[in-house]
Amino acid sequence: MNIYDQLQAVEDRYEELGELLSDPDVVSDTKRFMELSREEANTRETVTAYREYKQVIQNISDAEEMIKDASGDAELEEMAKEELKESKAAKEEYEERLKILLLPKDPNDDKNIILEIRGAAGGDEAALFAGDLLTMYQKYAETQGWRFEVMESSVNGVGGIKEVVAMVSGQSVYSKLKYESGAHRVQRVPVTESQGRVHTSTATVLVMPEVEEVEYEIDQKDLRVDIYHASGAGGQNVNKVATAVRMVHIPTGIKVEMQEERTQQKNRDKAMKIIRARVADHFAQIAQDEQDAERKSTVGTGDRSERIRTYNFPQNRVTDHRIGLTLQKLDTILSGKMDEVIDALVMYDQTQKLEALNK
Protein backbone atom coordinates (compact mmCIF):
# COMPACT_ATOMS: atom_id res chain seq x y z
CA MET A 1 0.00 0.00 0.00
CA ASN A 2 1.53 3.33 -1.05
CA ILE A 3 1.37 6.50 1.05
CA TYR A 4 -1.72 7.84 -0.72
CA ASP A 5 -3.65 4.62 -0.17
CA GLN A 6 -2.63 4.71 3.50
CA LEU A 7 -3.81 8.31 3.85
CA GLN A 8 -7.12 7.56 2.19
CA ALA A 9 -7.60 4.58 4.51
CA VAL A 10 -6.94 6.82 7.52
CA GLU A 11 -9.49 9.36 6.28
CA ASP A 12 -12.08 6.63 5.66
CA ARG A 13 -11.53 5.26 9.16
CA TYR A 14 -11.80 8.76 10.65
CA GLU A 15 -15.20 9.25 9.04
CA GLU A 16 -16.28 5.80 10.26
CA LEU A 17 -15.19 6.71 13.80
CA GLY A 18 -17.35 9.83 13.68
CA GLU A 19 -20.38 7.67 12.94
CA LEU A 20 -19.50 5.09 15.60
CA LEU A 21 -19.09 7.74 18.30
CA SER A 22 -22.66 8.89 17.74
CA ASP A 23 -23.99 5.32 18.01
CA PRO A 24 -25.96 4.92 21.30
CA ASP A 25 -24.58 1.38 21.79
CA VAL A 26 -21.01 2.71 21.66
CA VAL A 27 -21.79 5.70 23.88
CA SER A 28 -23.18 3.37 26.57
CA ASP A 29 -20.00 1.23 26.51
CA THR A 30 -17.53 3.42 28.42
CA LYS A 31 -14.41 1.42 27.58
CA ARG A 32 -15.17 1.17 23.85
CA PHE A 33 -16.22 4.82 23.68
CA MET A 34 -12.91 5.89 25.27
CA GLU A 35 -10.89 3.69 22.90
CA LEU A 36 -12.67 5.04 19.81
CA SER A 37 -12.48 8.64 21.05
CA ARG A 38 -8.74 8.25 21.55
CA GLU A 39 -8.36 6.70 18.08
CA GLU A 40 -10.30 9.57 16.53
CA ALA A 41 -8.18 12.16 18.37
CA ASN A 42 -4.98 10.39 17.28
CA THR A 43 -5.95 10.47 13.59
CA ARG A 44 -7.46 13.97 13.49
CA GLU A 45 -4.18 15.78 12.74
CA THR A 46 -3.31 13.32 9.96
CA VAL A 47 -6.73 13.66 8.33
CA THR A 48 -6.64 17.47 8.55
CA ALA A 49 -3.18 17.56 6.95
CA TYR A 50 -4.25 15.10 4.24
CA ARG A 51 -7.29 17.19 3.35
CA GLU A 52 -5.12 20.31 3.17
CA TYR A 53 -2.65 18.36 1.00
CA LYS A 54 -5.44 17.39 -1.41
CA GLN A 55 -6.40 21.07 -1.66
CA VAL A 56 -2.77 21.92 -2.51
CA ILE A 57 -2.82 19.29 -5.28
CA GLN A 58 -5.99 20.90 -6.60
CA ASN A 59 -4.33 24.32 -6.45
CA ILE A 60 -1.43 23.00 -8.56
CA SER A 61 -3.85 21.64 -11.15
CA ASP A 62 -5.78 24.92 -11.21
CA ALA A 63 -2.60 26.99 -11.59
CA GLU A 64 -1.34 24.81 -14.47
CA GLU A 65 -4.72 25.15 -16.18
CA MET A 66 -4.64 28.92 -15.67
CA ILE A 67 -1.19 29.16 -17.31
CA LYS A 68 -2.49 27.27 -20.34
CA ASP A 69 -5.51 29.56 -20.60
CA ALA A 70 -3.62 32.82 -20.03
CA SER A 71 -3.77 33.55 -23.80
CA GLY A 72 -1.06 36.18 -23.76
CA ASP A 73 -2.27 37.86 -20.55
CA ALA A 74 1.17 38.39 -19.00
CA GLU A 75 -0.17 39.53 -15.62
CA LEU A 76 -2.52 36.55 -15.27
CA GLU A 77 0.23 34.14 -16.36
CA GLU A 78 2.69 35.62 -13.86
CA MET A 79 0.14 35.33 -11.05
CA ALA A 80 -0.57 31.69 -11.98
CA LYS A 81 3.16 30.86 -12.08
CA GLU A 82 3.62 32.36 -8.61
CA GLU A 83 0.66 30.33 -7.34
CA LEU A 84 2.14 27.19 -8.92
CA LYS A 85 5.54 27.80 -7.32
CA GLU A 86 4.04 28.31 -3.84
CA SER A 87 1.77 25.29 -4.17
CA LYS A 88 4.61 22.99 -5.28
CA ALA A 89 6.69 24.10 -2.28
CA ALA A 90 3.70 23.46 0.00
CA LYS A 91 3.22 20.03 -1.60
CA GLU A 92 6.77 18.99 -0.68
CA GLU A 93 6.32 20.22 2.91
CA TYR A 94 3.03 18.36 3.30
CA GLU A 95 4.52 15.15 1.90
CA GLU A 96 7.31 15.21 4.51
CA ARG A 97 4.87 16.03 7.27
CA LEU A 98 2.44 13.30 6.21
CA LYS A 99 5.23 10.69 6.24
CA ILE A 100 5.87 11.54 9.88
CA LEU A 101 2.17 11.58 10.73
CA LEU A 102 1.81 8.09 9.24
CA LEU A 103 4.44 6.68 11.59
CA PRO A 104 2.95 4.21 14.09
CA LYS A 105 1.50 6.20 16.97
CA ASP A 106 2.46 5.55 20.56
CA PRO A 107 -0.99 4.86 22.08
CA ASN A 108 0.12 6.57 25.29
CA ASP A 109 1.21 9.88 23.74
CA ASP A 110 -1.93 11.80 24.71
CA LYS A 111 -1.98 10.52 28.28
CA ASN A 112 -1.19 12.22 31.57
CA ILE A 113 1.83 10.86 33.42
CA ILE A 114 3.02 9.74 36.82
CA LEU A 115 6.50 11.18 37.33
CA GLU A 116 8.90 9.70 39.88
CA ILE A 117 12.25 11.28 40.79
CA ARG A 118 14.73 9.76 43.23
CA GLY A 119 18.12 10.81 44.50
CA ALA A 120 20.52 7.99 43.63
CA ALA A 121 24.33 7.81 43.90
CA GLY A 122 25.84 10.78 45.72
CA GLY A 123 24.02 11.11 49.04
CA ASP A 124 22.86 14.62 49.94
CA GLU A 125 24.10 16.08 46.65
CA ALA A 126 22.04 13.53 44.67
CA ALA A 127 18.96 14.45 46.72
CA LEU A 128 19.54 18.17 46.12
CA PHE A 129 19.87 17.53 42.38
CA ALA A 130 16.64 15.50 42.44
CA GLY A 131 15.05 18.66 43.85
CA ASP A 132 16.51 20.68 40.96
CA LEU A 133 14.98 18.23 38.47
CA LEU A 134 11.61 18.48 40.22
CA THR A 135 11.71 22.27 39.89
CA MET A 136 12.73 21.98 36.22
CA TYR A 137 9.76 19.76 35.39
CA GLN A 138 7.38 21.93 37.42
CA LYS A 139 8.45 25.04 35.51
CA TYR A 140 8.32 23.24 32.16
CA ALA A 141 4.79 22.10 32.99
CA GLU A 142 3.86 25.75 33.62
CA THR A 143 5.11 26.75 30.16
CA GLN A 144 2.94 24.01 28.63
CA GLY A 145 -0.19 24.90 30.58
CA TRP A 146 -0.13 21.54 32.38
CA ARG A 147 -1.25 20.79 35.93
CA PHE A 148 1.54 19.54 38.21
CA GLU A 149 0.49 17.86 41.46
CA VAL A 150 2.97 16.40 43.94
CA MET A 151 1.30 13.25 45.27
CA GLU A 152 3.99 11.98 47.64
CA SER A 153 7.41 13.29 48.64
CA SER A 154 10.21 12.43 51.02
CA VAL A 155 12.93 14.98 51.86
CA ASN A 156 16.26 14.57 53.61
CA GLY A 157 17.93 16.70 56.29
CA VAL A 158 19.43 19.22 53.84
CA GLY A 159 16.18 19.84 51.98
CA GLY A 160 16.92 17.49 49.11
CA ILE A 161 14.47 15.04 47.58
CA LYS A 162 14.89 11.38 48.50
CA GLU A 163 11.83 10.51 46.44
CA VAL A 164 8.92 12.39 44.89
CA VAL A 165 5.88 11.15 42.98
CA ALA A 166 3.87 13.64 40.92
CA MET A 167 0.93 13.61 38.53
CA VAL A 168 1.32 15.79 35.43
CA SER A 169 -1.94 16.40 33.57
CA GLY A 170 -2.64 18.18 30.31
CA GLN A 171 -2.40 17.91 26.55
CA SER A 172 0.08 15.35 25.16
CA VAL A 173 2.12 15.17 28.38
CA TYR A 174 3.51 11.68 27.79
CA SER A 175 4.51 12.46 24.19
CA LYS A 176 6.94 15.12 25.45
CA LEU A 177 8.16 13.72 28.76
CA LYS A 178 8.45 10.02 27.89
CA TYR A 179 12.10 10.54 26.90
CA GLU A 180 13.02 11.65 30.45
CA SER A 181 13.12 8.17 32.00
CA GLY A 182 16.65 7.15 32.97
CA ALA A 183 19.64 8.27 35.04
CA HIS A 184 20.45 11.99 35.09
CA ARG A 185 24.02 12.83 36.13
CA VAL A 186 25.13 16.11 37.71
CA GLN A 187 28.68 17.45 37.92
CA ARG A 188 29.16 20.41 40.27
CA VAL A 189 30.90 21.65 43.40
CA PRO A 190 28.71 20.86 46.42
CA VAL A 191 28.07 23.60 48.97
CA THR A 192 29.86 21.49 51.59
CA GLU A 193 32.99 21.04 49.42
CA SER A 194 35.75 23.22 50.91
CA GLN A 195 38.41 22.33 48.29
CA GLY A 196 36.29 23.39 45.32
CA ARG A 197 36.33 19.92 43.78
CA VAL A 198 33.65 18.89 41.30
CA HIS A 199 31.57 15.93 42.48
CA THR A 200 29.45 13.62 40.34
CA SER A 201 26.02 12.48 41.53
CA THR A 202 22.95 10.97 39.92
CA ALA A 203 19.20 11.08 40.20
CA THR A 204 16.78 8.75 38.45
CA VAL A 205 13.60 9.72 36.65
CA LEU A 206 10.72 7.42 35.76
CA VAL A 207 7.85 8.53 33.53
CA MET A 208 4.78 6.29 33.35
CA PRO A 209 1.53 6.94 31.47
CA GLU A 210 -1.52 7.29 33.68
CA VAL A 211 -3.66 4.17 33.40
CA GLU A 212 -7.42 4.44 33.76
CA GLU A 213 -9.32 1.72 35.62
CA VAL A 214 -11.23 0.77 32.46
CA GLU A 215 -7.88 0.29 30.65
CA TYR A 216 -6.13 -1.88 33.23
CA GLU A 217 -8.01 -3.61 36.01
CA ILE A 218 -6.17 -4.97 39.03
CA ASP A 219 -7.80 -7.90 40.79
CA GLN A 220 -8.53 -6.78 44.35
CA LYS A 221 -7.41 -10.24 45.56
CA ASP A 222 -3.92 -9.31 44.36
CA LEU A 223 -3.76 -6.26 46.64
CA ARG A 224 -2.87 -6.01 50.32
CA VAL A 225 -3.94 -2.72 51.88
CA ASP A 226 -2.70 -1.60 55.31
CA ILE A 227 -4.05 1.47 57.11
CA TYR A 228 -1.85 3.31 59.64
CA HIS A 229 -1.34 6.69 61.29
CA ALA A 230 0.39 9.32 59.17
CA SER A 231 3.75 10.45 60.56
CA GLY A 232 5.14 13.96 60.71
CA ALA A 233 8.68 15.26 61.15
CA GLY A 234 10.58 13.26 63.75
CA GLY A 235 8.26 10.32 63.29
CA GLN A 236 5.42 11.54 65.52
CA ASN A 237 1.88 10.56 64.60
CA VAL A 238 0.06 13.62 63.29
CA ASN A 239 -3.44 12.14 62.93
CA LYS A 240 -5.62 10.67 65.65
CA VAL A 241 -7.47 8.75 62.95
CA ALA A 242 -5.50 6.31 60.80
CA THR A 243 -5.50 7.87 57.31
CA ALA A 244 -2.23 6.72 55.73
CA VAL A 245 -2.40 3.86 53.24
CA ARG A 246 0.16 1.23 52.31
CA MET A 247 -0.80 -0.77 49.22
CA VAL A 248 1.10 -3.82 47.94
CA HIS A 249 0.53 -5.65 44.66
CA ILE A 250 1.26 -9.18 45.84
CA PRO A 251 2.23 -10.84 42.51
CA THR A 252 4.90 -8.23 41.70
CA GLY A 253 5.77 -6.91 45.16
CA ILE A 254 5.18 -3.34 43.97
CA LYS A 255 4.43 -1.12 46.97
CA VAL A 256 2.95 2.37 47.35
CA GLU A 257 2.60 4.38 50.55
CA MET A 258 0.41 7.47 50.63
CA GLN A 259 -0.17 9.87 53.52
CA GLU A 260 -0.29 13.31 51.89
CA GLU A 261 -4.07 13.67 52.10
CA ARG A 262 -6.16 14.20 55.24
CA THR A 263 -8.59 11.38 54.58
CA GLN A 264 -8.03 7.67 54.18
CA GLN A 265 -10.20 7.53 51.03
CA LYS A 266 -8.21 10.22 49.22
CA ASN A 267 -4.93 8.51 50.14
CA ARG A 268 -6.37 5.19 48.96
CA ASP A 269 -7.49 6.71 45.64
CA LYS A 270 -4.07 8.24 44.99
CA ALA A 271 -2.26 5.06 45.99
CA MET A 272 -4.48 3.08 43.62
CA LYS A 273 -3.72 5.49 40.77
CA ILE A 274 0.03 5.10 41.30
CA ILE A 275 0.03 1.33 41.80
CA ARG A 276 -2.12 0.82 38.69
CA ALA A 277 0.40 2.81 36.64
CA ARG A 278 3.38 0.97 38.16
CA VAL A 279 1.91 -2.50 37.65
CA ALA A 280 0.87 -1.73 34.06
CA ASP A 281 4.31 -0.26 33.43
CA HIS A 282 5.98 -3.33 34.96
CA PHE A 283 4.27 -5.68 32.51
CA ALA A 284 4.75 -3.26 29.61
CA GLN A 285 8.50 -3.30 30.29
CA ILE A 286 8.52 -7.10 30.25
CA ALA A 287 6.79 -7.02 26.85
CA GLN A 288 9.33 -4.47 25.58
CA ASP A 289 12.24 -6.55 26.82
CA GLU A 290 10.96 -9.40 24.67
CA GLN A 291 11.36 -7.10 21.65
CA ASP A 292 14.86 -6.05 22.65
CA ALA A 293 16.22 -5.24 19.19
CA GLU A 294 13.30 -2.98 18.35
CA ARG A 295 13.45 -1.33 21.77
CA LYS A 296 17.10 -0.39 21.36
CA SER A 297 16.52 1.14 17.94
CA THR A 298 14.45 4.00 19.35
CA VAL A 299 15.23 6.76 21.80
CA GLY A 300 13.12 6.96 24.93
CA THR A 301 12.39 3.28 25.43
CA GLY A 302 15.81 2.03 26.48
CA ASP A 303 17.23 0.67 29.71
CA ARG A 304 16.04 2.82 32.60
CA SER A 305 19.32 2.47 34.45
CA GLU A 306 21.07 3.96 31.41
CA ARG A 307 22.70 7.37 31.88
CA ILE A 308 20.76 9.58 29.50
CA ARG A 309 21.91 13.10 30.33
CA THR A 310 24.70 15.01 32.09
CA TYR A 311 24.31 18.44 33.68
CA ASN A 312 27.74 20.08 34.09
CA PHE A 313 27.48 23.22 36.23
CA PRO A 314 31.06 24.58 35.86
CA GLN A 315 30.67 24.58 32.07
CA ASN A 316 26.94 25.52 32.05
CA ARG A 317 26.55 22.46 29.81
CA VAL A 318 23.82 19.88 29.28
CA THR A 319 24.60 16.78 27.18
CA ASP A 320 22.03 14.23 26.09
CA HIS A 321 24.09 11.10 25.46
CA ARG A 322 21.44 9.27 23.41
CA ILE A 323 21.50 11.74 20.53
CA GLY A 324 24.87 13.45 21.04
CA LEU A 325 23.24 16.82 21.77
CA THR A 326 25.27 19.35 23.78
CA LEU A 327 23.91 22.76 24.79
CA GLN A 328 25.70 25.46 26.78
CA LYS A 329 22.38 26.39 28.36
CA LEU A 330 22.23 24.53 31.66
CA ASP A 331 20.76 27.48 33.58
CA THR A 332 18.10 28.00 30.90
CA ILE A 333 17.12 24.32 30.79
CA LEU A 334 16.94 23.94 34.58
CA SER A 335 14.66 27.01 34.64
CA GLY A 336 12.11 24.95 32.70
CA LYS A 337 12.91 25.98 29.13
CA MET A 338 13.30 22.39 27.89
CA ASP A 339 11.83 22.71 24.39
CA GLU A 340 15.16 22.60 22.55
CA VAL A 341 16.11 19.30 24.21
CA ILE A 342 12.68 17.70 23.91
CA ASP A 343 12.17 18.81 20.28
CA ALA A 344 15.56 17.30 19.36
CA LEU A 345 14.61 13.98 21.00
CA VAL A 346 11.25 13.88 19.21
CA MET A 347 12.90 14.65 15.86
CA TYR A 348 15.58 11.99 16.40
CA ASP A 349 12.95 9.40 17.33
CA GLN A 350 10.89 10.22 14.23
CA THR A 351 13.96 10.06 11.98
CA GLN A 352 14.93 6.65 13.37
CA LYS A 353 11.43 5.32 12.78
CA LEU A 354 11.32 6.70 9.23
CA GLU A 355 14.65 5.03 8.45
CA ALA A 356 13.38 1.75 9.88
CA LEU A 357 10.27 1.95 7.68
CA ASN A 358 12.33 2.64 4.57
CA LYS A 359 14.61 -0.37 5.06
Swiss-Prot record:
PROSITE patterns cross-referenced by the UniProt entry: RF_PROK_I
Originating species: Streptococcus agalactiae serotype III (strain NEM316)
Sites bearing N5-methylglutamine, chain numbering: 236
Localisation per UniProt entry: Cytoplasm
GO MF terms, alphabetically ordered: translation release factor activity, codon specific
Keyword Electron transport: no
Keywords: Cytoplasm, Methylation, Protein biosynthesis
Identification of the protein by name: Peptide chain release factor 1
Entry-linked HAMAP family: Rel_fac_1 (MF_00093)
Stretches that traverse the bilayer: none
Family recorded in the similarity comment: Belongs to the prokaryotic/mitochondrial release factor family.
GO cellular component terms, A-Z: cytoplasm
Pfam families: PCRF, RF-1
Post-translational modification: Methylated by PrmC. Methylation increases the termination efficiency of RF1.
Function: Peptide chain release factor 1 directs the termination of translation in response to the peptide chain termination codons UAG and UAA.
